[in-house]
């Protein structure tokens, strides 16, 4: 693997798009902090769940979500809730990134967003962001420089693609299981707890370990 700084392989922009509705602006949907925080990937299927707001044409041009990008949480009440990444899996026509988040656009000749998303969610990256956050007490934040200086380990593009596809396939299966569980009929309580447990899917956890970057 080759070692880079994030700024050497991607651009980083900080969104300041708020949730207000202004008559002079265009209607959009916002991908907000919680959308980034709770999703491995942002897919077209989530479009209708994004809140409606407005934004200027300049904001739309800068923060419109495009396939291959990565969004990152930038500000939060605890240092452990910042630096959480999500992969933008589809192109969107009217969904832009909301404030308290950063938008990372990789140079795809060097790095793929699906791999960056996995790397930024690694234990090593989480420790980097937690230790580099500024603030204390009520609010923690990541500066643009801190995000840009993040050490990144890159394998060849083909290997990045395989790693990204592995995580994407797992995320899809998890989403399918969630949808199945959501649509299951409420169990008859008279059947007892055992019947409820039979309907549950086991939790599968695994980890890819990246060598130390620093």
Regions found by a protein language model. Give the residues of each.
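A short beta-sheet element
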Residues: 32-34, 52-54, 59-121
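A short glycine-rich beta-alpha junction/loop motif
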Residues: 94-102, 134-164
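Short, well-ordered beta-strand elements within core beta-sheets of diverse protein domains
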Residues: 53-56, 102-108, 148-154, 168, ...
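Residues that recognize and position ribonucleotide moieties
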Residues: 2, 29, 95, 118, ...
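Short coil/turn segments at secondary-structure boundaries
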Residues: 19-26, 44-46, 131-133, 206-208
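Sequence-specific dsDNA recognition surfaces
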Residues: 7-23, 34-70, 214
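Non-catalytic DNA-recognition/assembly elements of restriction-modification systems
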Residues: 1-17, 149-195, 204-214
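Short, positively charged
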Residues: 114-146
